From Swiss-Prot:
GO molecular function terms listed in the Swiss-Prot or TrEMBL record: fluoride channel activity; fluoride transmembrane transporter activity; metal ion binding
PANTHER family for this protein: FLUORIDE EXPORT PROTEIN 1-RELATED, FLUORIDE-SPECIFIC ION CHANNEL FLUC 2
Gene of this entry: fluC2
Transmembrane segments: 5-25, 35-55, 59-79, 95-115
Keyword field: Cell membrane, Ion channel, Ion transport, Membrane, Metal-binding, Sodium, Transmembrane, Transmembrane helix, Transport
Compartment(s) where it occurs, according to its Swiss-Prot or TrEMBL record: Cell membrane
Protein family per UniProt: Belongs to the fluoride channel Fluc/FEX (TC 1.A.43) family.
Name by which UniProt lists this protein: Fluoride-specific ion channel FluC 2
Membrane topology per record: Multi-pass membrane protein
Regulation of its activity: Na(+) is not transported, but it plays an essential structural role and its presence is essential for fluoride channel function.
Amino acid sequence: MKIYSAVFIGGALGACLRYGLNLWIHTGQFPAATWLENAAGSLLLGILTGFFMIGAKRPLLSAFLGTGFCGGFTTMSTFSKETVMLLQGQPSLALLYVAASLISGIIFALIGVFVGRRIAGIQQRKGLQEK
């Protein structure tokens, strides 16, 4: 039951932050807020993945931050809706949006995994030195 609560609370916090960013970031025709949310979420999820690959396994924290927060913060449905809206009048901008979203998401996830693994490795070395 704790895992479900962690996912629920993390998801609520992530969704609230996403909503706040959408209110704060108003751009022209390019949906910058959704792009930023998905790129930042990919980076954070990459960091968590890399960290938990090497570091201590923390299922509650992983559920809260990964499934919950990142799941609530990022949004595939809004990305899809915005792409369809752009396709109606600006197909070239829609193509740019899709390409930028996919490429940056993958790149940020890779960077995140690298950073997370480095953090976990540093923590492991500190733990060994203290013993």
